[in-house]
């Protein structure tokens, strides 16, 4: 009987609530903290989230390097951290790296 009551309460809560609380949602970079940017979510279409700046080896977009960017960012990745640059690798992908001379291919 107790299990049936718990299931009933769970079903009631699921049908009553039709929204979710998402923390870190943003529209522009200025709404995010230091070391982050407002990037498009990979999972939820139309949602932008405060995302950490790219670390070494992470994918980046070569045209997305300005922080803060005052319009809506059009990429799912943030620019690289200040000490890194967005470099094209032999596989055709762009990644954050320290220096092209020191990259091991």
UniProtKB/Swiss-Prot annotation:
Main location: secreted
Protein name: Prokineticin-1
Keyword Signal: yes
PANTHER family tied to this protein: PROKINETICIN, PROKINETICIN-1
Keywords: Angiogenesis, Disulfide bond, Growth factor, Mitogen, Secreted, Signal
Location of the protein in the cell: Secreted
Organism annotation: Rattus norvegicus
Keyword Cell membrane (UniProt): no
Name of the gene encoding the protein in the UniProt record: Prok1
Superkingdom classification of source: Eukaryota
GO terms of biological process kind: angiogenesis; cell population proliferation; endothelial cell proliferation; positive regulation of cell division; positive regulation of MAPK cascade; positive regulation of vascular endothelial cell proliferation; regulation of angiogenesis; vascular endothelial cell proliferation
Stated family: Belongs to the AVIT (prokineticin) family.
Gene Ontology CC annotations of this record: extracellular region
Signal peptide, first to last residue: 1-19
GO molecular function: growth factor activity
Cystine residue pairs: 26-38, 32-50, 37-78, 60-86, 80-96
Function description: Potently contracts gastrointestinal (GI) smooth muscle. Induces proliferation, migration and fenestration (the formation of membrane discontinuities) in capillary endothelial cells derived from endocrine glands. Has little or no effect on a variety of other endothelial and non-endothelial cell types. Induces proliferation and differentiation, but not migration, of enteric neural crest cells. Directly influences neuroblastoma progression by promoting the proliferation and migration of neuroblastoma cells. Positively regulates PTGS2 expression and prostaglandin synthesis.
